[in-house]
């Protein structure tokens, strides 16, 4: 709950009195700690006092986020936190200090991907936008609410799963290995030091096991001799 990340929490708290009028048994859970926690808590306490009950609960820092997300119906947040909520099958309102995307569905996919779900370059968030989309969500029938959660989860499984990330990484490595780029080796070479010469030979042998005819360049005090003996540049 650092000041650089607490804007939306404050805006949501500001909107709670109006949302509470329309949503029965409203409960808002704010998770996190940081240098702005006390200010956020002061706002929450003031709203709770005004409403006469603890609508807003601040948990402080937590590591068991899954247990807090599981019972919720709607998540408000940004970036990785929003993706984690989507992975848990929860509808999300994507909003952060950098901007506002809103209640996430297929129509918001392009801007979500373009901004890495961080909202940079989007319209700025404010309490009215948050209130509008929270009420919009709770006015949907249960089937539509469920569909929003399912859409987010399927997106995570398809585009942001561990398997997908690993596959993408492997593709990058495969692409790099196909390029005939020079492999530069720098060390204490060309000085007839048996230890360093043995190390260089071992490195070259290992590289040749992984790639046939690697394009190796060695920085050496005696380039001609090193090139002739090790068959490198």
Give the location of each predicted region:
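Acidic donor-binding loop of glycosyltransferase active sites
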Residues: 67-83, 89-93, 98
């Amino acid at each position: 709950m650092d000041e650089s990340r607490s804007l939306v929490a404050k805006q949501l708290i500001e909107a709670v009195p109006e949302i509470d009028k329309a949503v029965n048994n409203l409960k808002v859970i704010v998770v996190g700690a940081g240098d702005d926690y006390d200010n956020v808590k002061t706002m929450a306490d003031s709203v709770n006092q005004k409403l006469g009950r603890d609508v807003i609960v601040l948990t402080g820092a937590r590591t068991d986020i899954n247990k807090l997300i599981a019972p919720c119906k709607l998540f408000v947040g940004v970036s990785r936190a929003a993706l984690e909520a989507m992975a848990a099958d929860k509808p999300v309102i994507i909003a952060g200090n950098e901007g506002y995307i809103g209640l996430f569905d297929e129509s918001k996919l392009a801007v979500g991907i373009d901004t890495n779900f961080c909202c940079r370059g989007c319209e700025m968030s404010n309490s009215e936008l948050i209130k509008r989309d929270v009420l919009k969500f709770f006015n949907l029938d249960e089937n539509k609410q469920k569909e929003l959660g399912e859409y987010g989860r399927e997106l995570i499984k398809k585009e942001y799963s561990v398997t997908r990330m690993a596959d993408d990484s492997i593709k990058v490595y495969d692409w790099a290995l196909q390029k005939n780029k020079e492999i530069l080796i720098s060390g204490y070479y060309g000085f007839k030091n048996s230890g360093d010469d043995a190390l260089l030979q071992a490195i070259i042998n290992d590289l040749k096991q992984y790639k046939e005819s690697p394009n190796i360049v060695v920085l050496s005090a005696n380039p001609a001799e090193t090139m002739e003996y090790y068959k490198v540049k």
